[in-house]
Curated annotation (Swiss-Prot):
Coiled coil feature spans: none
Protein family according to the UniProt entry: Belongs to the GrpE family.
Any one GO molecular-function label of the UniProt entry: adenyl-nucleotide exchange factor activity
Its job: Participates actively in the response to hyperosmotic and heat shock by preventing the aggregation of stress-denatured proteins, in association with DnaK and GrpE. It is the nucleotide exchange factor for DnaK and may function as a thermosensor. Unfolded proteins bind initially to DnaJ; upon interaction with the DnaJ-bound protein, DnaK hydrolyzes its bound ATP, resulting in the formation of a stable complex. GrpE releases ADP from DnaK; ATP binding to DnaK triggers the release of the substrate protein, thus completing the reaction cycle.
SUPFAM superfamilies: Coiled-coil domain of nucleotide exchange factor GrpE, Head domain of nucleotide exchange factor GrpE
Residue numbers spanned by region Disordered: 1-35
A Gene Ontology biological process term: protein folding
Signal peptide: none
Annotated protein name in UniProt: Protein GrpE
PROSITE patterns: GRPE (PS01071)
Subcellular location as annotated: Cytoplasm
Keywords recorded for this protein, A-Z: Chaperone, Cytoplasm, Stress response
Oligomeric and partner information: Homodimer.
Length: 189
């Protein structure tokens, strides 16, 4: 028995694909396109979710920063208020002493002097507690333009640009000049 292969009846002898092959290829292309589209849609959904998450995180961080700024402003405001309150409270004993001195009807000059000295001592203590420090340069010390204000230059036997006399004490508060000391300075010779 001889087996002869006979060409299939549907086979195209021209070398071009048959309609069934074209249909199968087209179906495969459509399937690949559908897979690519569904993958793209899945990636898009993932990216949209990530975008939403990042947007939410940004808004939360922005709100948290705004809240932190408000809290800081409130704390600064309270610190100023309470610092002023503390300073005023430390001056109340001085006020009490001055009022008591003024209420004395038959005070002697010596009693007034002692009362004034005690009140001055109270005032200096209150200023020290609140970090107000006296600037009182000694004669002959170097002139410091950051803490001293020269009122005049006078001829003196000491080195030029040194303090000759203090006309009015200055004050620092927390290492910042509240008022410079008014001084006379030795003139160059």
């Amino acid at each position: 028995m001889s087996e002869n292969k006979q060409p299939e009846q549907n086979q195209d002898l021209t070398g071009e694909p048959s309609p069934e092959e074209l249909e199968a290829a087209q179906a495969a292309d459509e399937f690949d396109a559908m897979n690519a589209a569904s993958e793209a849609q899945a990636q898009l959904a993932v990216l949209q979710a990530k975008n939403t998450e990042l947007s939410d995180n940004y808004l939360r961080a922005k709100a948290e920063a705004e809240n932190a700024r408000r809290r800081a402003e409130d704390e600064i405001s309270k610190a100023r208020k309470f610092a002023l309150e503390s300073f005023a409270e430390s001056l109340l004993p001085v006020l009490d002493s001055l009022e008591a001195g003024l209420n004395m009807k038959e005070a002697t000059l010596e009693q007034l002097r002692e009362g004034s000295q005690a009140t001055l001592k109270q005032l200096k203590a209150a200023l020290e507690r609140n970090k107000v420090i006296e600037i009182n340069p000694v004669a002959g010390s170097k002139f410091d333009p950051h803490q001293h204000q020269a009122i005049s230059m006078v001829p003196a036997a000491q080195e030029a640009n040194t303090v000759v006399a203090v006309l009015q004490k200055g004050y620092l508060i927390a290492e910042r000049v509240l008022r410079p000391a008014l001084v006379t300075v030795a003139a160059p010779q």
